[in-house]
Amino acid sequence: MRALTMILAALLGCTVLTGCVRENPTVVALLASDATQRLEPRVDAEAFEARVEATCEECTVRVYDAEGDAAAQAAQADEALDDSADVIVLDPVEVEEAEALVGGGEDEVPVVAHTTLVPGADWFVGTAEPVVPDDSGPEAGSDLEAARQVVTGKRRSMLHVPATAMSEQAADVAVAVLAGAEVEGAEDLEGVPSFLHAVTEVRLADLTTVLVGQGAVTLEELCSGSTARRCERIGFV
């Protein structure tokens, strides 16, 4: 991360030690399909913003939340461009609609597709395989509720999508692109340089190492209320 900061600082004509002030800050736009929903988290907007701020002092992050509306996302893309976005990280509501947002306009802005591959995007950060929606009911949609059901034995396992890790990597790619730095480790997926994360099947023995360890849930959230006694019996607390 320090390397990215130093590269970008040099690009902007200032040093990490002395700093610099730009009249027009570098703008990183995050277009989320639905940043507030918890049932199937795709983007960790807070982690994304924190990562950009940690690696690029001169960057400003602007988060646009389409709330599941493709038309709203198209309007937000126009707004981001009007606000002089230097790079766009796009979590598409609908792929077909999102294709129109990629490569449009005379001054093409780099696009990093997040979660779902968008043909024509410059980069992609997502999962190796499409995530099949959980069919255990709406109460089992979030990582927390699904994990609590694994604790109680209502379900044997759950699928964990590493939204935080994906969002942090999307931030790293965006900052590197701005700096003109080489982004290593990508693989080709349908002609798009991609970083693919694994969707993990999590069982009871893996809850603390995977979910708690990665910060997806806290031990207090996992072992409170109706799951408290069960957590004590299995040695979680």
Where are these regions (language model features)?
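Extracytoplasmic "Venus flytrap"
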Residues: 27-55, 62-71, 93-94
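Structural motif
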Residues: 60-82, 136-142, 146-149
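Hinge/cleft segment of the Venus flytrap/periplasmic-binding protein
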Residues: 169-237
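Flexible loop/hinge segments that line or gate small-molecule binding clefts
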Residues: 95-132, 147-152
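Hydrophobic alpha-helical segments within soluble ligand-binding/sensing domains
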Residues: 124-136, 142-147, 162-182
